[in-house]
Amino acid sequence: MPELKIKTEKVEKQLTKEPLVLKTPKEQIDNLGKFYATGKRKNAIARVWLKVGKGKIVVNNKTIAQYFPSETYVKTILQPFVLTKTIDQYDIICTVRGGGISGQKGAILHGISKALDKSAPDFHAILRKGGLLTRDSRVVERKKYGQRKARKKTQFSKR
């Protein structure tokens, strides 16, 4: 019987401990009703604010057409809105730094997708299926010493 008494004492101690408090994730909505998300691609980091509006997109205080020279960049950035059929329903303000134009485009795309997901959880399955919520983790491989590039080596001579 002493074994049973020890076990019940352990159970009582566990029950009397403070209850486990689960931390809920911080809401990513500010006072103005904007949804906030960050997107990353290569060395670029984009901070994106999304709010209900008329479809205006501002990147680093410039319009999207001024910031990105090619129309194909603009089309890929608008992909989440095309998939969710919400073109011209949200205004976007984003700041992006680091990397080149292609990396910045990918970071903005990732940030917009995450913000859209927060604004309406119904879009989660659509955006996930389109592969827009997954962070593209490919980065440039580092150069190794004794080689010309990351993989390129000097010409081998047998004699």
From Swiss-Prot:
InterPro entries per UniProt: Ribosomal_Su5_D2-typ_SF, Ribosomal_uS9, Ribosomal_uS9_bac/plastid, Ribosomal_uS9_CS, Ribsml_uS5_D2-typ_fold_subgr
Gene Ontology terms describing biological process: translation
The organism's place on the tree of life at top rank: Bacteria
Molecular-function GO terms, alphabetical: RNA binding; structural constituent of ribosome
GO cellular component terms, semicolon-separated: cytosolic small ribosomal subunit
Ribosomal protein found in the keyword field: yes
SUPFAM superfamilies: Ribosomal protein S5 domain 2-like
Record keywords: Ribonucleoprotein, Ribosomal protein
Keyword Ribosomal protein: yes
Family: Belongs to the universal ribosomal protein uS9 family.
PANTHER family per UniProt: RIBOSOMAL PROTEIN S9, SMALL RIBOSOMAL SUBUNIT PROTEIN US9M
Name of the molecule in the record: Small ribosomal subunit protein uS9
The organism of origin for this protein: Rickettsia conorii (strain ATCC VR-613 / Malish 7)
Upper classification of the organism: Bacteria, Pseudomonadati, Pseudomonadota, Alphaproteobacteria, Rickettsiales
Gene name, Swiss-Prot/TrEMBL: rpsI
